[in-house]
Structures are given as C-alpha cells and as structure tokens.
C-alpha cells in the first residue's frame, strides 16, 4: 500500500444497527456510548506498535499500601521476562499450597526460550495445566529460570519456593 503524505485522523465509532441474524431486525442502540482510542506512530510492522497497544489497553493501576515489613527494595523488579513478546498473564498463590503460580503467553508466534528472573531462589519448577494439575517437573531452579515456550503457547508453571 502507499503511505498517505498527509496526516490521517478519523475518530469514528463504528457500530452495527442490524441484528447479526440474516433476517434479523434493525434496532436502536439507545443510551450513552463511549469509547477511547490512543494515537501514536511507529515504524512499519506490528511488533513496533505492540507494546504501545498493550500499554494503552491495559493501564497500570497503583495502590499504595503501608509497608508491613517486606524486604524487596523499591528499585528492584518482582519479576522480569527476557522477551518483550512473552506476556505474564497470571501470577498468584497456588490453590493447593503456598507456592507461586505464573502463566506465560507467547505472543509473537515463534518457538523460543525465555528467561524469567526473580529476586528469590526457586527450588523447583513444575509445568502444570490451566487448573494447576502438575504435568512435568522441569530441571530448572535458582533466581533465573530458562523456560521453553512454543509458538502461541499458554504455559502455566508452579514455582516451588
């Protein structure tokens, strides 16, 4: 496609006013409707706009709490992932014990090996299914966990502390 040599901005809310059934009726969408959109420019390719799109659609909400004796310094991350196209989609306490569950989603469509870095030692990593049933114990431990992800994979891991 050719690039426009002029700025293009068209903020139109598209909506359908006809039922999705082939013989469906027309209907009115009464009430107040609102939408938001974010505008930016980036180099060609979806990978260049992906971080902005994710950040725009998932704002970061901070809730300040009183420190109750935690030892993690304010300058450190709780968790780092080496690949920008691997999403941490879940982090929580395991249902059956006091260990940590993380769920990673590979967003780029490529098989890859990533590194998850934590500020504490992990004794063992166990791959689980979505309902935390243990599937496979991995030969991984320490503060840096090297994990393999398949293309478009959604993997859940139990981190034994």
Walk through the language-model features, giving the residues of each.
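Terminal accessory/anchoring regions of large secretory-pathway or extracellular enzymes
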Residues: 1-161
């Amino acid at each position: 496609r050719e690039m426009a040599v002029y700025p293009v901005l068209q903020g139109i809310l598209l909506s359908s006013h006809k039922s999705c059934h082939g013989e469906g009726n027309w209907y009115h969408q009464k009430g107040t409707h609102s939408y938001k959109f974010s505008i930016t420019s980036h180099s060609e390719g979806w990978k260049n706009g992906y971080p902005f799109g994710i950040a725009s659609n998932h704002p970061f909400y901070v809730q300040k709490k009183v420190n109750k004796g935690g030892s993690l310094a304010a300058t450190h991350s709780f968790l780092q992932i080496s690949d920008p196209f691997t999403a941490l989609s879940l982090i929580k306490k395991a249902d059956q014990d006091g260990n940590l569950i993380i769920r990673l989603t590979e967003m780029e469509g490529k098989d890859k090996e990533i590194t998850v870095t934590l500020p504490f030692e992990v004794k063992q990593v166990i791959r689980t299914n979505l309902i935390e049933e243990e599937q496979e114990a991995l030969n991984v431990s320490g503060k840096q966990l090297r994990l393999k992800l398949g293309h478009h994979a959604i993997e859940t891991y139990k981190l034994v502390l």
